[in-house]
Amino acid sequence: MKPRILSYGEIIFDLVGGKPFLGGAALNFAWVVNQLGGEATLISAVGNDDFGLEALSIIENYGINGHINFSGHPTGTAIVDSDGKFDIAHPAAWNQIEIPDLEDGAYDLLYMGTLAQMSSFNRERLANLLQSLTVVVFLDLNLRPPFYSKEIIFDSLRMANIVKVNVEEWQEIKKLTVIEDPFGFMDYFNLSHLAITRGYEGASFFFDGQELQYRPRKITEIDPTGAGDAFSAGLAMGILSNIPAIDILKLGCDAGAAVAGIRGAHMKLPYSVRAQLIL
């Protein structure tokens, strides 16, 4: 049976050089999950505008299941600079994500970040959802200043089983928690897995008192947008599929590297990546 995954969070059009590319961490994650043989269901919101209608059409064409409501705010947008930094328009539709009633036991994992939790509207509904489901929670912090707080970070970590951060976010987390050791951090928040990504240098993977490192082959980076989300999708699918830990890490790194080598977050993954996970 395919891993069944809920992907909760924002839909955003990334404006790169003035050209719009459909993205948002939750959508990017779902797109890669489906390519790796999973069955993703996206929970998000768009505005009743041209971008919103375009997003719904594209998502339908992608074959991604969705619970996507229309919000009173415009569809999310973000200006992305050459370093991959985001200037996110706010407020936006992703501030008001309605969550339908979902059957407990119907899903294996829920993916979430911190950006969509900036609104109390979303935090309340997400907390209620997690109380109603027995599911593995994958937290990809995706810290986007100024759209996070210590309270949101700590609450999210307490809900999580698996956490992925990049190396800059890890430095921020160490300051907030005053915990330097990854295993001490995992013990404090009762995590089963922790991944720290380091861009072209690969990533570290912590689990069961063990640490693994992997560095993918060097690529020519075109656009880092969505690479971290692809890594998370590979990691989640690898964990749910019970493949060896080093293969989980390799899958995540190779998926992220493939996406970083093209412009925009939605590429068809090369067979060399997809073939690592034959379900």
Spans of features found by a protein language model:
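Glycine-rich phosphate/adenosyl-contacting loop at the front of the ribokinase-like
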Residues: M1-I64
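Conserved phosphate-binding/catalytic region of the ribokinase-like
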Residues: M1-R4, V178-L279
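Structural motif
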Residues: R4-L6, D108-L109, I162, H193
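Active-site metal-binding loops of divalent metal-dependent hydrolases
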Residues: E10-I11, A25, L115, L141, ...
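Alpha-helical segments flanking ligand/cofactor-binding loops in enzyme cores
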Residues: W31, S57, F154, F183-G184, ...
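Hydrophobic anchor at the start of a short beta-strand
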Residues: E39-A40, G66, V137, L194, ...
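Conserved N-terminal subdomain of the carbohydrate kinase-like
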Residues: E39-T114, Q276-L279
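Conserved beta-alpha-beta core of the PfkB/ribokinase-like small-molecule kinase fold
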Residues: L109-G184, G202-A203
